Amino acid sequence: METYTGIPEELKFAVLERIQPTEPEREKLFAIQEELASQVKIAAEKLGIPGVLVKMVGSAARGTWLSGTHDIDVFISFPEETSRKDLETLGMAIAREVARYAEHAEDRHAEHPYLNITYKGFDVDLVPCFRVASASQIKSAVDRTPFHNDFVKPRIKGHEDEVLLLKQFMRGGGVYGSELKTQGFSGYLTELLVIRYGSFKNTIYAACSWKPGEKIDIMQHGEIEHEEPLVVIDPTDPRRNVAAALSLDKFCTFIDHCREFLKNPELSFFFPAPILPLEDSEILEKLESRKSTQLAVVFKTPDVVEDVLFPQLYKMEQAVAALLKEYDFTVIKTGVWSGNTETAVMMELISGTLPNVKKHIGPPVWVKVHAEKFKEKYQAADGVFGGYIENGKYIFEILRKYPTARGLLEDRLMSCSLGKQVHQSVNEGFEIIENAGICRLKEYDFRIYLRKWI
């Protein structure tokens, strides 16, 4: 059984010194929140829209935000009887009125539209929602968020630093963020873990023993079964698993991060050293040492938000791997990367080239009808090198249709399940890059990704 060391208090203090918001930061945040709330009210009055209330939600409203992060969630709530059409039309009208004072504005879409703005250096989401009586009566997914605020705020009071430590620890391990690109832990989930276990330290110790199917049910709802690796029943809505976005790999990465940290608690688990981009010479050295085949399918990045793009990229990744395996290529690993202009689906194969000949195994000779049909088909076929019997079965050595992975992908990629926007982009044009050709991709973030890849 593994023996873990304690977590030095001085280490926690050192981390908190770097992540606790300063008093000037707090004052600025509160001032911006008040400004935004006032502007929403003024906009509603100006547009003649009654019954609108403003609620600040998220980590900024709960005191669990990390220094240097400037995210504010402003919920523009409408009476429950408001129609969805009016919610979207009137809510966005108010948001756009507020956005007149912003440096930048961008329409975004979850279950319904909302507006993301940059306001005095803060990243602000202006989100219309229905004002319902309880989270069990929500009319759209965002309606439950104000109830999260009401549940967490009184219970987390006095434990805000524990949440900050857990968030930064998850960041250091690459598992923080519930967006579909990351598939990690959300801010709300980290808060619930601290509420459940009482502290950062207790959460870390508990996670060391987690297994897939781990269930946390703070309010003892226990009504619905979920199949995700970690199940954290939403205290405000017993039908929902707060950890539904967490992938198995990120779940296990967090467990491993906790175990390694407790063996040797260090600042680097919170603040890992920056990863440097891979230089061309290093790429060539790694290719030479690995002796495998690196392939990248490169195409123009679709103009959609990441939460739409990345599920499609992961779908493409799986489909391409399945295609390669179908044609006898051995896939070591796959991955995806997306930048502002180009996107790459990465594959590493044991070899990108196979022999021209393929051993095709037929039925046993004694299965007369099937065996004779098999023999007749391949005896008369073109591209057959010869037939014989081995272990009681007919064997024909036939010409392989795709001896190279590049040729296979160039010919069959569009037959894969790619997702709507990715399919459109790939259909407009794609490039297969192999081995040293990867040096063509110069984007800084890609070279950082590549260092982790190979």
UniProtKB/Swiss-Prot annotation:
Cofactor: Mg(2+)
Annotated InterPro entries: CAA_C, CCA-adding_arc, CCA_tRNA_nucleotrans_2, NT_2-5OAS_ClassI-CCAase, NT_sf, NuclTrfase_I-like_C, Polymerase_NTP_transf_dom, tRNA_NucTransf2
UniProt-annotated binding residues for CTP: S59, R62, H148, K167, Y176
GO process annotations (BP): RNA repair; tRNA 3'-terminal CCA addition
Record's keyword terms, sorted: ATP-binding, Magnesium, Metal-binding, Nucleotide-binding, Nucleotidyltransferase, RNA repair, RNA-binding, Transferase, tRNA processing
Binding site for Mg(2+): D71, D73, D125
A molecular-function term among this protein's GO annotations: ATP binding
SUPFAM superfamilies registered for this protein in UniProt: Nucleotidyltransferase (SSF81301), PAP/Archaeal CCA-adding enzyme, C-terminal domain (SSF55003), PAP/OAS1 substrate-binding domain (SSF81631)
Phosphoprotein as UniProt keyword: no
UniProt EC number: 2.7.7.72
Gene3D superfamilies with a match to the protein in the record: Archaeal tRNA CCA-adding enzyme catalytic domain, Beta Polymerase, domain 2, CCA tRNA nucleotidyltransferase, domain 2, Poly(A) polymerase predicted RNA binding domain
UniProt keyword NAD, yes or no: no
S-S bonds: none
Name of the molecule in the record: CCA-adding enzyme
Recorded name of the encoding gene: cca
